[in-house]
């Protein structure tokens, strides 16, 4: 698969041959969905908790004697049915993450890349180095490229000026190639890869 390489200013910088085994697969929604669920579950803090009947500050004394009052039988005031009582079966602190095989995770990334390539929303740029960190100038560059919602993947390190200029622009995310992931690819309309990112992904999936 051949794709034209563009510059940040919208010019041409040649072309690149993309590996069909990475960018030419038929996207499978089930694999992408499994990966997104895996990522979102893993990032959950899981710090939710409530007080059960052993945690609330109520006396454990029996409210009144068992028989002879005509009232229903009750024990401690900390029971869930009473105002101020403990919560029954409430959330507890726990880890929400679940396992997903490494091969499935790698395959999901290939399918996400292939989905962008198939939809013609994959752009390759030669480099993302800029001379200053002016956001206004960066917005003008993105308008030339037709980018309003994009994930931009740099090389092993993102140019500092580029990162500072782009971080204030809504719906524009910038990551080094090590940080590329399925969720961030799918949540933006366009995927922008640098030539260095293309080479790094090729090496990664060898």
UniProtKB/Swiss-Prot annotation:
Keywords (A to Z) from UniProt: Ribonucleoprotein, Ribosomal protein, RNA-binding, rRNA-binding
Gene Ontology biological-process annotations: translation
GO MF term set: rRNA binding; structural constituent of ribosome
A GO cellular component entry from the record: ribonucleoprotein complex
Family indicated by similarity: Belongs to the universal ribosomal protein uL4 family.
Subunit structure of this chain's protein: Part of the 50S ribosomal subunit.
Protein task: One of the primary rRNA binding proteins, this protein initially binds near the 5'-end of the 23S rRNA. It is important during the early stages of 50S assembly. It makes multiple contacts with different domains of the 23S rRNA in the assembled 50S subunit and ribosome. Forms part of the polypeptide exit tunnel.
Protein name (Swiss-Prot/TrEMBL): Large ribosomal subunit protein uL4
Record organism: Methylorubrum extorquens (strain PA1)
Underlying gene: rplD
């Amino acid at each position: 698969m051949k794709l034209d390489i563009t510059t940040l200013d919208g010019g041409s910088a040649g072309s690149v041959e993309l590996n069909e085994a990475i960018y030419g697969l038929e996207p499978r929604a089930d694999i992408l969905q499994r990966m997104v669920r895996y990522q979102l579950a893993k990032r959950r803090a899981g710090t939710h908790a409530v007080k059960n009947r052993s945690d609330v500050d109520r006396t454990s004394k029996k409210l009144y004697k068992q028989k002879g009052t005509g009232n229903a039988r009750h024990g401690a005031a900390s029971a869930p049915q009473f105002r101020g009582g403990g919560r029954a079966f409430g959330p507890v602190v726990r880890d929400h993450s679940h396992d997903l095989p490494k091969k499935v995770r790698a395959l999901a990334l290939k399918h996400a890349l292939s989905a962008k390539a198939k939809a013609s929303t994959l752009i390759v740029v030669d480099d993302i180095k800029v001379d200053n960190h002016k956001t206004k100038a960066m917005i003008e560059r993105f308008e030339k490229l037709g980018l309003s919602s994009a994930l931009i993947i740099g090389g092993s390190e993102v140019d500092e000026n580029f990162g500072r200029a782009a971080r204030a622009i809504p719906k524009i995310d910038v990551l080094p190639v090590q940080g590329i992931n399925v969720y961030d690819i799918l949540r933006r309309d366009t995927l922008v890869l640098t030539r260095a990112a293309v080479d790094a992904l090729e090496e990664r999936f060898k």
